[in-house]
Design a protein with these regions (language model features):
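Well-ordered alpha-helical segments within folded domains of soluble proteins
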Residues: 1-2
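FAD-binding core of flavoproteins
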Residues: 13-15, 19-174, 178, 188, ...
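Active-site lining segments that contact anionic ligands and/or coordinate catalytic metals
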Residues: 89, 124, 144, 156, ...
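Extended, low-aromatic, Leu/Ala- and acidic/polar-enriched alpha-helical coiled-coil segments
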Residues: 156, 163, 194-204, 232-235, ...
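C-terminal helix-coil-helix/basic helical segment that borders enzyme active sites and/or dimer interfaces
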Residues: 177-191, 204-237, 250-258
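Alpha-helix capping/hinge segments and adjacent helical runs
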Residues: 225, 232-312
Length: 312
């Protein structure tokens, strides 16, 4: 979210909003998702109308992460309903608290919350926006640019999620290795059993593939190359990879892994969200498949849709 402000904010917006964020003085949230729209961002119904020198925003938002602790919100709303589909939306910088931006509730999920976690990162909030007045100069990135900015932000968010998933998977495998080298059953270490080694080898292969995917995408991002196809493929792979590795680590720990004596059980419930956030698996797979067909029809090969253009 801060990267969006860095890349699209005016000098004044960066001074007023980005600088205190970078200094750790304030926190920010992103209010895009709506109940009725879900993964279809173009289905959003929150509207913003220009009234003199202010925009007036009305609507509802859903699963706005960290809204309960935020001092600033990026709010996406429909400003141009008659424009082409992807040019109907704009993004606004909102200073919080504001009576027009109210948290209805913090949404309970399958991942248990801790007091420290709520204090540091807040929760996922349901928001009602009623006659929220925003100064005209708080429009971010230009009118009609909200959708494209949002997709750009999500692309980098998927990269960050992927890094987190690799780190968690690596740590889970570390915990599993630490357990199997000490645990003995029937007079033999678990680490010396062929089946256990196969399980750990499979995890290592998945982590290795995930790392290479991330490095390739990061390279393309640094070079300003189009990374949408690879990012979609990797998003699905990494979300399922971390689930598989953590699940294997739990299995290798036995009942201990199912308990809260290790962090594995907590991680397991938390990572289920990875197959939903920033686009569910099915949407990414659908788009990936469409791009494969498009590549073949254009080039006579699917290579460009499968990471074939590794470096340019």
């Amino acid at each position: 979210t801060m990267l969006t402000l860095l890349e699209h904010g005016t000098d004044d917006q960066k001074e007023r909003f980005l600088k205190p964020l970078l200094n750790g003085e304030k926190r920010i949230c992103y209010s895009m998702t709506e109940k009725a729209a879900g993964a279809d961002a173009t289905g959003m119904q929150t509207k913003a109308e220009l009234d003199g020198d202010e925009w007036v925003i009305n609507g509802e938002k859903w699963f706005s992460s960290s809204a309960s602790v935020a001092d600033i919100a990026l709010v996406m709303a429909k400003t141009d309903p008659e424009a082409p589909r992807h040019e109907q939306y704009s993004t606004f910088l909102v200073e919080l608290p504001d009576p027009g931006y109210q948290i209805l509730r913090n949404i309970e999920t399958m991942q248990p919350h801790t007091d420290l976690g709520l204090k540091l990162g807040g929760s996922h909030s349901e928001i009602t926006i009623e006659n929220l007045r925003v100064p005209r100069e708080n429009l971010l990135g230009g009118r009609g640019q909200g959708f494209n900015m949002g997709q750009h932000r999500l692309a980098y968010g998927r990269l960050r999620h992927g890094m987190h998933n690799v780190a968690m998977a690596q740590r889970a495998l570390d915990l599993a290795a630490g357990h199997v080298v000490q645990r003995e059953t029937f007079g033999k270490r678990l680490a010396d059993r062929q089946g256990v080694r196969w399980m750990m080898a499979d995890c290592a292969a998945e982590i290795y593939k995930a790392r290479l995917m991330l490095l390739h995408i990061a390279y393309k991002a640094e070079k300003g190359m189009d990374l949408r196809q690879e990012n979609g493929i990797a998003k699905v792979f990494l979300a399922n990879m971390v689930h598989q590795v953590v699940d294997t680590a739990i299995q290798l720990h036995g009942a201990l892994g199912y308990s809260h004596d290790t962090p594995l059980a907590r991680w397991y419930t938390g990572i289920r969200s990875q197959r939903l956030v920033d686009g569910p698996d099915e949407v990414h797979r659908w788009r990936t498949g469409a791009n494969i067909i498009k590549a073949y029809e254009k080039h006579g090969t699917t290579a460009s849709a499968c990471g074939g253009e590794l470096f340019e």
